[in-house]
C-alpha cells in the first residue's frame, strides 16, 4: 500500500516537471516561427520597394 502512494507521488512530481519543460520548449519554437515570419515580412517589403524603383526607372526610360 505504501508503494502505491510513493509511486503516485513520484508520478505526480514527474508530470508537473515535464509539463513545465514542455511549455518552455513550445515557447521557444513559437518564437523561432515568429522570427521567421518577421524576416519574411521584411524581405517582402524590401523586395517590393526594389521592384517599385525598377518600375519607375523603366517608366522614365520609356519617356
Curated annotation (Swiss-Prot):
Signal peptide (UniProt feature, chain positions): 1-23
Q: Which residues carry this modification: Arginine amide?
A: 62
InterPro entries according to UniProt: Cecropin, Cecropin_insect
Sorted keywords for this record are:
Amidation, Antibiotic, Antimicrobial, Immunity, Innate immunity, Secreted, Signal
Q: Name one GO cellular component term.
A: extracellular space
Q: Which domain of life is it from?
A: Eukaryota
Where can this protein be found?
A: Secreted
Decide whether keyword Signal is in the record: yes
Its Gene Ontology biological processes? antibacterial humoral response; defense response to Gram-negative bacterium; defense response to Gram-positive bacterium; defense response to insect; defense response to virus; innate immune response; response to Gram-negative bacterium
| Its job | Cecropins have lytic and antibacterial activity against several Gram-positive and Gram-negative bacteria.
Please report which protein family the annotation says this sequence is part of: Belongs to the cecropin family.
Q: What is this protein called?
A: Cecropin-C
Write down the species: Drosophila erecta (Fruit fly)
